[in-house]
Curated annotation (Swiss-Prot):
Its EC number is 3.6.1.9. Keywords: Cytoplasm, Hydrolase, Nucleotide metabolism. One of its GO terms (biological process) is nucleotide metabolic process. The record marks R12, T70, Q152 as: Important for substrate specificity. Disulfide bonds: none annotated. It is found in: Cytoplasm. The active site is at D69. Pfam families: Maf. This is dTTP/UTP pyrophosphatase. It comes from Geobacillus sp. (strain WCH70). GO terms for molecular function: dTTP diphosphatase activity; UTP diphosphatase activity.
Length: 186
């Protein structure tokens, strides 16, 4: 069997690939995730996903390497992972009662070519109270997640509805990723 590598240390991406019953190994890429040039959110996630995959694929050229990057976008502004609880609260206030997009760039590099794509999911939040925001922040859950929330955790209660791929919001558009890996010959 050909080697499949996830170029990510994300526990959520690991769980999703395990859900698909795939045999893979994890080799985090440890790249600089800053985008120094001006890019659209779509271009930014695609570029970061490619950089992550390429950093690993350069050392494993005969393997299939998956790189991914996920961001939350509200009114054309990228909301990354909050650095402080205050920043998390500000992000959640922005998202409260509004719609936003979750974008995941995916790069699959293989001996048979590559697949690069961006998956976009629209998420609608209920109006949140200050108590809900602070109770959620007190759990610590929002601190390592883009947009300061994880749909698969307690923040599921904030989501009114979504349009698109649920797993994309978790961190990896699973079915499309698996189909692309197989299309490339894995």
């Amino acid at each position: 069997m050909k080697q499949l590598i996830l170029a990510s240390s994300s526990p959520r991406r690991k769980q999703l690939l395990e859900l698909a019953n795939l045999r893979f190994q994890i080799l985090a890429s440890h790249i600089d995730e800053q985008i120094h040039e001006t890019k659209s959110p779509e271009q930014a996630v695609q570029l970061l996903a490619y950089r992550k995959a390429k950093a690993v694929a350069d050392h494993y050229p005969h393997s299939y390497v998956i790189g991914a990057d996920t961001v939350v976008v509200y009114q054309d502004n990228i909301l990354g992972k909050p650095k402080t609880e205050e920043e998390a609260a500000a992000m959640l206030r922005m998202l409260s009662g509004n719609e936003h997009h979750v974008l995941t760039g995916v790069a699959i590099l293989s001996p048979n070519g590559q697949s690069l794509f961006v998956e976009k999911t629209k998420v609608f939040f209920w109006d949140l109270t200050e108590e809900e925001i602070f109770d959620y922040i007190a759990t610590g859950e929002p601190m390592d997640k883009a947009g300061a929330y994880g749909i698969q955790g307690r923040a599921a209660l904030f989501v009114k509805r979504i349009e698109g791929d649920y797993f994309n919001v978790v961190g990896l558009p699973l079915s499309r990723t698996v189909r692309e890996v197989k299309r490339l010959g894995w």
